[in-house]
Design a protein with these regions (language model features):
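Short alpha-helical transmembrane segments in multi-pass integral membrane proteins
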Residues: 1-37, 94-161, 203-258, 319-385, ...
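Residue-level signal for short hydrophobic patches within transmembrane helices
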Residues: 26, 30-49, 53, 75-82, ...
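Transmembrane helical elements of multi-pass membrane transporters/channels
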Residues: 35-54, 155, 166, 189, ...
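Small-residue-rich hydrophobic transmembrane alpha-helices
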Residues: 66-126, 163-182, 291-357, 389-411
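Hydrophobic transmembrane alpha-helices of multi-pass small-molecule transporters
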Residues: 78-81, 193-197, 223-227, 303, ...
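Short runs within selected transmembrane alpha-helices of multi-pass transporters and secretion channels
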Residues: 87, 156-174, 182-190, 211-224, ...
C-alpha cells in the first residue's frame, strides 16, 4: 500500500510539474508575469511593512534605539547576502533545469542550496555572538548606540541559520514558478512579527531586545511554513539524501548567485560606511539623530522598491523557464514589459514621496527636528533618481537569470558599491551631510548610465536568437 501511495504521489508531482511547464511556456507573457508577480509583490510589501512597523515601535523608545537597529542592518545585509546567494544561485539553476525537463538535477540542487546556508548560518551566528560588541562597533555604533545595537543583535544571531535558509527556500519556490507558497511563508512570518512587536517591546517591557526576539521568532515560524511548502505536490522536494556538496553544484550556485552576493555584500560595506560618515559629519550632539534619519530613509525606500522588486521576481521564473526552453522571443517580450511597468510606477511613486517626505519621516520619530530635516532631504534626493531604477533592476535580473554571471555581477555592484561608496566618501568630504544625503541619487544615475548599453546589447542578442530560432 505504501509503495502504491508513493507511486501515485510521484505521478501527481510529475503531472503538476508538466502542467506548470506548459503554463510557463505557452500562456501569454504579460498575463503570466502579472500572475507570478502578485504573490511576490504581496510578500515583499508585507515584509517591508513589518520592517517599517518595527522601526515605528522602536522609534517610540528613543532616537538611540532607532540608531542601534540601524547599525544592525549591516549584519542583516550579511544574512541577506548569503541567503540570496544560495537562493538565487540554486533557484535560477532549478528554473532552467525544469525548463529543460531535468527533474533529478533540480532536486539535488534544491537540497544543496538549502542545507548549505543552514550550516553556514549556524557557524556565522556562533562566531558573531562571541564577538558581539566589537562587531557592533565595527558596524558604526558609538558609545550611546552600542547597548541598543547589542540588544538587537543577540536574538538575530541565534536565528541566523533559519533567516539565511528561509531566503533560500523563498527564492527556490519563486523561481520554480510557485511563488504562492513563498508568499504564504514570508507573509505569515511578517504578520506574526507585527503582532509580537508591541507585545514584546511594550507589554513585556523588553525594549529593543523585544523587537529582536519578535523578529527571530517570526522568522523561524516563516521558515517552517516555507519548508512545508516545498513538500507540496508540484514543488521540488528537499531531501537530505539529495544534498550534494560537489564542485559542480557550488559552481552553478556561484554562477547564478554571485551577482546577489556581490550586491548584498557591498550593501554591508555601504551601510557601515554610511553610518560612520553620518556620525563623522553630523552636527555635534546629533550623531544618533543623523544615523537614525538614514535608517528611516532606508526603510521607506525599501518599501518603495518592494513593488518593483516583487514585479521583477514575477518576471524571473518566466524568463528562466522560457530561456531554458529556448523561447527567446518570450524572454524579450517579458523583459520589455517588466521595464515599462516598473518605470511608469516609479515615476508616479517618486513624485508622491517627494511631496510628502517630511510627513513620512516624522511618522517614525516626530519629536526630533534634526532627524526630520536630514531624513527629508535624503529621501527627496533619492526620489529624483527613482524612475531610472526600473530598467536597471530588470536588466540585472535578466542577466542573472539566464546565467550571464559577470554582466549581472558588474551591474549588481554598481548601485551599492562601485558608485555609492565613492559617492559617500567624496561627496561628504566636499559638502558634508548634504553630500551624504545626495550620494545615493548620484550612484543611481551612474548605475543607469552603466546599465543602458548592457540593456541595448541583450535586447539585440535576444532579437537575433529569436529570429534564428524561428
Amino acid at each position: 500500500m505504501r509503495s502504491n501511495s508513493i507511486i501515485m504521489s510521484n505521478i501527481n508531482d510529475e503531472r503538476k510539474i508538466n502542467e506548470r511547464y506548459k503554463m510557463m511556456t505557452e500562456q501569454p507573457v504579460r498575463r503570466l508575469i502579472l500572475k507570478m508577480a502578485v504573490p511576490t509583490i504581496i510578500s515583499m510589501l508585507v515584509t517591508t511593512i513589518y520592517n517599517m512597523v518595527d522601526s515605528f515601535y522602536v522609534g517610540h523608545l528613543s532616537t538611540e534605539a532607532v540608531a542601534g537597529v540601524g547599525v544592525s542592518f549591516a549584519y542583516m545585509a550579511f544574512i541577506n547576502a548569503c541567503g540570496f546567494f544560495f537562493g538565487h544561485g540554486s533557484g535560477n539553476y532549478i528554473s532552467r533545469a525544469l525548463g529543460a525537463k531535468q527533474g533529478q538535477n533540480a532536486g539535488r540542487m534544491a537540497a544543496t542550496g538549502f542545507f548549505s546556508p543552514l550550516i553556514l548560518g549556524a557557524i556565522a551566528g556562533l562566531i558573531c555572538m562571541i564577538f558581539i560588541s566589537p562587531l557592533s562597533r565595527a558596524m558604526g555604533a558609538t558609545d550611546s548606540i552600542l547597548p541598543y545595537a547589542n540588544d538587537y543583535l543577540r536574538f538575530i544571531l541565534i536565528a541566523t541559520p533559519f533567516m539565511m535558509s528561509s531566503l533560500t527556500l523563498n527564492n527556490q519556490l519563486r523561481l520554480q514558478g510557485n511563488a504562492r507558497f513563498g508568499m504564504i511563508g514570508i507573509a505569515s512570518g511578517a504578520i506574526l512579527n507585527i503582532i509580537l512587536d508591541p507585545i514584546f517591546i511594550f507589554g513585556l517591557d523588553m525594549g529593543v531586545s523585544g523587537a529582536s526576539l519578535a523578529t527571530a521568532v517570526s522568522q523561524c515560524f516563516g521558515w517552517s511554513v516555507l519548508l512545508w511548502g516545498t513538500s507540496r505536490p508540484g514543488n521540488v522536494h528537499i531531501k537530505f539524501k539529495n544534498f550534494t556538496p560537489s564542485l559542480y553544484y557550488y559552481k552553478e550556485i556561484t554562477r547564478g548567485g554571485l551577482p546577489s552576493l556581490a550586491r548584498q555584500a557591498l550593501s554591508v560595506v555601504a551601510t557601515i560606511s554610511l553610518n560612520r560618515m553620518a556620525v563623522h559629519y553630523a552636527l555635534p550632539g546629533n550623531e544618533a539623530s543623523t544615523v537614525a534619519a538614514f535608517t528611516i530613509v532606508s526603510r521607506i525606500t525599501m518599501f518603495c522598491f518592494a513593488i518593483v522588486i516583487g514585479f521583477g521576481q514575477g518576471f524571473q521564473p518566466v524568463c528562466g523557464y522560457n530561456y531554458g526552453a529556448k523561447l527567446y522571443a518570450r524572454v524579450k517580450e517579458s523583459y520589455m514589459f517588466c521595464i515599462t511597468i516598473t518605470t511608469a510606477f516609479l515615476i508616479v511613486l517618486g513624485t508622491v514621496v517627494y511631496i510628502f517626505a517630511p510627513d513620512m519621516i516624522s511618522w517614525f520619530r516626530g519629536e526630533d527636528p534634526e532627524l526630520i530635516r536630514v531624513g527629508s532631504q535624503a529621501l527627496r534626493w533619492q526620489c529624483v533618481a527613482f524612475p531610472l531604477m526600473g530598467m536597471c533592476t530588470a536588466t540585472n535580473m535578466l542577466f542573472q537569470n539566464i546565467g550571464y554571471t559577470w554582466q549581472a555581477t558588474l551591474l549588481s555592484m554598481c548601485r551599492q558599491g562601485l558608485y555609492f561608496l565613492p559617492a559617500v566618501f567624496i561627496m561628504s568630504w566636499l559638502w558634508g551631510i548634504t553630500g551624504l544625503e545626495a550620494a545615493q541619487a548620484v550612484a543611481d544615475i551612474c548605475t543607469f548610465l552603466t546599465s543602458l548599453p548592457f540593456a541595448i546589447w541583450i535586447y539585440r542578442l535576444l532579437t537575433a536568437k529569436s529570429q534564428h530560432n524561428v
